[in-house]
């Protein structure tokens, strides 16, 4: 069962033609025929509420779990109108025959109880055709205003048990919220759940903000602000919404920051005297270290997961291309050789791919390549796609898509690394420059 779906994900990652896969330890399966995924059908009845006050939470939690799994593209929810018998008792023995009859290959069952402002959720997953649980049942608790996080955690658990890979639902995205006409657009930092819920604004000035980037622990955000009249790097504590300037003065402009995996070092671009190079800095000491020294423009740096290397874009060859070098500087190796211009590279948290923006023949693309530049694949194509960011499990990419025309509205989209399951991400206003957090604790 788990082997079947894990094999599917491996096939997606390697983009190999995969036929129907039969699990060795049960009948649960996902079919891939000629590169088309056959989502696994599952049922998630409304969770059982112990009191009338818990009823809405029970319904909403089941709904969010289903949305998470369906949104991954690997699962298909069976409509509740197809259920043969109602689900009314969490502790009763499951009637697998009724669920088999509607071809529910997985069943997710749960119960919700309230005590003051606290909510407790118990849940179990079942392999219907094998007639057994998908691992031990679990219990999660929290405050009632955190019920969505509990739902995401349940979905992550089910996703992980069925695929053998980490989930990505209990995560957040920081981005630039855009309002107003194109020639007078207000840009604010905002943060939300990965699915667009619970939007909060982190800045509220008229100064332009760009390129927010999460720390490895998700509690801080680097970004570029024009509050002083020229670009400077700020770091913001998400929980307390406190910020401080990390780069300032000396006639230089600093931008495109990103954290190292250790959370204490940052790498960024600095422009001075008409030249743009890469620098690193310890955020506690504030002492910069030059990493490149060339007459070309070096920008958009991103660390490898182990912190040993940096990928960045440079026009040293005459056009914008991607290069990899040691995190301490030194000789850089070019890894992009296709037609067009490359930019905004970002290393996958798994370490296996680098995502990038490509411009060629009047179109923009989000693509991925191996870390040595091999196996380049373009996942999207439009008037303007740019700025990829990886999900915590390295299987999904979120990016900015801007529409053509006078309004030039920017929105967020996501796509899996096979190029399938392209879809918009819900935001209340225009949105750009996303950065995906790690899974929350």
Curated annotation (Swiss-Prot):
Per the UniProt entry, what are the Gene Ontology biological process annotations, in alphabetical order? cell division; protein import
Name any GO cellular component annotation: periplasmic space
Could you tell me the keywords of this UniProt record? Cell cycle, Cell division, Periplasm, Signal
Signal peptide positions are: 1-23
Q: What InterPro entries does the record tag this protein with?
A: 6-blade_b-propeller_TolB-like, PD40, Tol-Pal_TolB, TolB_N
Q: List locations, semicolon-separated.
A: Periplasm
How is this protein organized at the quaternary level?
Answer: The Tol-Pal system is composed of five core proteins: the inner membrane proteins TolA, TolQ and TolR, the periplasmic protein TolB and the outer membrane protein Pal. They form a network linking the inner and outer membranes and the peptidoglycan layer.
* Protein name in UniProt: Tol-Pal system protein TolB
Q: Which organism is it from?
A: Ruegeria sp. (strain TM1040)
Kindly list the organism's lineage.
Answer: Bacteria, Pseudomonadati, Pseudomonadota, Alphaproteobacteria, Rhodobacterales
């Amino acid at each position: 069962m788990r082997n079947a779906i894990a094999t599917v994900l491996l096939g997606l990652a390697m983009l190999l033609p995969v036929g129907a896969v039969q699990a060795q330890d049960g009948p649960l399966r996902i079919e891939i025929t000629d590169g088309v995924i056959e989502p696994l059908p599952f049922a998630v009845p409304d969770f059982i509420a112990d009191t009338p006050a818990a009823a809405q939470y029970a319904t909403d939690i089941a709904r969010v779990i289903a949305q998470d799994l369906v949104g991954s593209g690997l699962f298909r929810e069976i409509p509740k109108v197809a259920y043969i018998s109602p689900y009314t008792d969490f502790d009763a023995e499951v009637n697998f025959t009724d669920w088999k009859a509607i071809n529910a290959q997985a069943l997710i069952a749960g119960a919700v109880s309230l005590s003051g402002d606290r909510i407790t959720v118990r849940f179990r997953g079942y392999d219907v055709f094998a007639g057994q649980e998908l691992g031990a049942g679990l219990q999660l608790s929290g405050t009632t205003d955190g019920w969505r996080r509990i739902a995401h955690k349940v979905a992550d658990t089910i996703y992980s048990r069925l695929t053998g890979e980490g989930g990505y639902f209990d995560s957040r995205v920081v981005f630039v919220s855009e309002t107003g006409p194109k020639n007078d657009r207000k840009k604010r930092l905002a943060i939300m759940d990965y699915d667009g819920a619970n939007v909060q604004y982190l800045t509220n000035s008229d100064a332009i903000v760009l390129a927010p980037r999460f720390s490895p622990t998700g509690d801080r955000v680097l970004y570029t602000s024009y509050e002083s009249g020229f670009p400077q790097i700020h770091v913001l504590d998400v929980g307390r919404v406190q910020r401080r300037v990390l780069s300032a003065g000396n006639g230089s402009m600093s931008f495109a920051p990103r954290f190292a995996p250790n959370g204490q070092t940052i790498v960024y671009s600095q422009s001075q005297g008409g030249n743009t190079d890469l620098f690193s800095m310890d955020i506690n000491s504030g002492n910069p270290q030059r990493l490149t020294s060339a007459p070309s423009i070096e920008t958009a740096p991103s660390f490898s997961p182990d912190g040993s290397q940096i990928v960045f874009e440079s026009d040293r060859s005459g056009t914008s291309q991607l290069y990899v070098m040691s995190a301490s500087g030194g000789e850089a190796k070019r890894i992009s050789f296709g037609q067009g211009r490359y930019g905004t590279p970002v290393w996958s948290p798994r370490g296996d791919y680098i995502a990038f923006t490509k411009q060629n023949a009047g179109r923009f693309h989000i693509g991925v390549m191996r870390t040595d530049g091999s196996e380049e694949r373009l996942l999207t194509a439009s008037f303007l796609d740019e700025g990829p960011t990886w999900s915590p499990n390295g299987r999904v990419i979120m990016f900015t898509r801007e529409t053509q025309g006078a309004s030039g509205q920017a929105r967020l989209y996501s796509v899996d690394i096979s190029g399938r399951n392209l879809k918009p991400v819900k935001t209340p206003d225009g949105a750009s420059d996303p950065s995906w957090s790690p899974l929350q604790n």
